[in-house]
């Protein structure tokens, strides 16, 4: 067992998430930090995006969002705040959605970590 990889703590996962988010490496975040059966929860008032389970569905949801974007002008994510097995951060983007004018979108994202992997993400906007 001495060759086994150490399980990342919630702080480790949050730090790595933030490191990758700063350079827009969202696919790498999903590939590296998410559990295969992770759940992604959108608010009830979300237009078009739904709550899904499993990485294939989460990737498809990301692709669906990308197809709604006409032009991405910029984005940000703040330093994560860790409490127990959860971390949260504020994220946002300056974006033009297809058929709409340029806008700023801001949200709070909360992530649950179990055994070194993200098992749930929930968005508030």
Predicted ranges, named:
Residues 34, 93-95, 109, 125:
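Short beta-strand segments enriched in hydrophobic/aromatic residues
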